[in-house]
Amino acid sequence: TKKVYEIAPSTTINGAKAYSNMGGSQWATSNVYAKVMGVVKTSNAVFPDKHGAGRCAKLTTLLEHVKAAGIVNMDVLVSGTIFLGKMLEPVSNTKNPYSKMEMGIPYTKTPKFLQFDYRLVAPAGAPIYSNGFGSKKTLSGRDNAEVFVILQHRWEDSKGNIHAERVGTGRERFGKTTMGWVNKHRIPIWYGDIRKHAGYKPYMGLISKEK
């Protein structure tokens, strides 16, 4: 038996069942329930934890061992993530991961910043790449935690094509272990073309189609 957590009201769902938002929060997690060729597997890298008098989400990075007799036997590196939106479960294959989630919620105002409390324990050593196919690889550099807000204007044209225009951007990377909790940290949200903004960094720009 394996526990899989969601940001949701305090309750328990028993059995291999896909989770659907039960209210109380619009946040979803990368924890996932998969059913591939009749085999049920789960992945959990986001856990509940304590913060002050309340609770918080603990995002971890770990190696999940996936094994099913005669079908698959592999290690997959999983990074815990939370996002506004929902997962589309059960996941039935590993193709095009972003098609398995519906990221984003409608917005009608112009927020100035995202505020949150955080604590970071940065891993020592070089990052590892493992997608379950082939051997694990050690990469150069360091891995970072990242928080981003991307506000978009989306529309569908007369031919059914979906378009998205970047409207607002808030993005920051975190790579150093903190001395305890950092409370009320703010990531500003900038609007329009931010490339000439004093605080602009290359990773904040538009994402190329290749990535």
For every predicted segment, state its role:
Residues 1-115, 130-132, 140-211:
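Aromatic (Trp/Tyr/Phe) and Gly/Pro-enriched flexible surface segments
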Residues 118-138:
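Short amphipathic, basic-aromatic surface patches that mediate peripheral association
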